[in-house]
Amino acid sequence: MDSLNSLKGRNLTMLVDFYEMTMANGYLKNGMGDTVAYFDMFFRKVPDGGGYVIMAGVEQLCEYLKGLKFTPEDIEYLRGKGFSEEFLDYLADFKFSCDVYAVPEGTPIFPGEPIVTVKGPIMQAQFVETMVLLCINHQSLIATKANRIVRAAQGRPIMEFGSRRAQGFDAAIYGARAAYIGGCAGTACAVSDIMFGVPALGTMAHSWVQLFDTELKAFCAYAREYPDNCVLLVDTYNALKSGVPNAIEAFKRELLPRGYRPKGIRFDSGDIAYLSRKARKMLDEAGFEDCTIVASNSLDEYLIRDMIGQGAKVDSFGVGERLITSSSSPVLGGVYKLCAVEKDGKICPRIKISDNVAKISTPCFKKPWRLFDRETGKAIADLVTLNNEVVDDTKPYELFDPDFTWKRKIVENYVAKPLTVQLFKDGECVYECPPLDEVKKHCAEQIDTLWDEVLRFDNPHNYYVDLSQKLWDEKQRLLAEHGKKDEQ
């Protein structure tokens, strides 16, 4: 299992977009290889038209950065691509030396704010772009989808069932991890239990029932083998005419005489709202009021919400491909942009300009903050400042919309907390990733700090990410400077 044990045992140093190599070689040849640069990762749009994203993938990013090393085979490959010997010598002696900051896993994050910041020699800070985006984009997407589904279930457990339809085995493994962060109770993916401690759950498939001469024999055999965790799949033939009655009979024959109670039955097809109501009545009349009903079958947050609204008697849900692929909105479009460079001992901001206002980047070495109401504990807004600014929460603070600056609000009686923590200092990991159960708990606690309006599935309230006055002024200065250059 070592070969799959998270990122350990796999050298993914060369998992880069090829232009990282061409740029790094070019920086070195132009005498710019040691220029200190600052990059931010951020995203512009929430998947599914939602109100928030859940940060995930930080642990895997740390593992990747700790393991950066170019092998002789890597060097030979790049030599064959025509890169300079000077560049290849640099890679042969490569040692990561950047500072890295990130929002902790399980924290809600919002468009426009820096969620990962990398500071270091331009060759290194540029080189890690692909894996920064890959680690964070994928797991944050799945954690967010899982959290939406969990909230739709209104306290009923959600099990992640999507491994077989994930887009590759890494997507299955890390998707199960991310789904657990988002609030799922467990996974069908056994290797994620081995690697991360995500509880592995599962009982039977239709093939179990089909293999036996009769459905009743199949149920009785399973009940004998797993009396303390007996969940029977009842829709192989006819759920209400044979499946549920045979399950009840198997419970009576195999479990009750041995002092066990049934764990549940599962539906994987049909009109589950209708079937579950009928099955609940049948189970209750047979004395199995404590027998749970599990539903699966291409579910998502909208179907689960509708089923509950229609009176479905379902106690837990198994959710597969629509979770593990986030099929309704399958991409978190995180980007990685240069925001500053050091020159003559000073940090000089850089900006990316576009005709599309939404794609104009925010310059400077920055720090994101979250402002909480002292009385309610609810998040008021996020604030992005220059890195050396301190938000004094003993004083009123004027927030303003960075695009529509006449929209202003003075906040008082609030607590300001920095959003990011330092992961690496001078290339050494200084952050201890918390256990996954703690990350999951942190996620649930932080979601509770968001107003219900932000959590709506449809047309959620726009949670504000504002800029400090100093940062906004610097952005406007750069825009004006570039505007003058264009006129010349």
Sequence positions of predicted segments:
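Gly/Ser/Thr/Ala-enriched C-terminal appendages of enzymes
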Residues: 2-35, 48-50, 284-286, 299-488
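Buried, small/hydrophobic-residue-enriched core segments of structured protein domains
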Residues: 2-36, 45-47, 82, 88-100, ...
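N-terminal, Lys/Arg-enriched amphipathic/low-complexity engagement segments
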Residues: 33, 37-92
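A residue-level signal for beta-strand positions that form part of recognition/binding surfaces
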Residues: 38-40, 97, 158, 335, ...
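Short, positively charged
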Residues: 80-88, 168, 395-403
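Hydrophobic residues within beta-strands of alpha/beta enzymes
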Residues: 201, 265, 293, 315-317
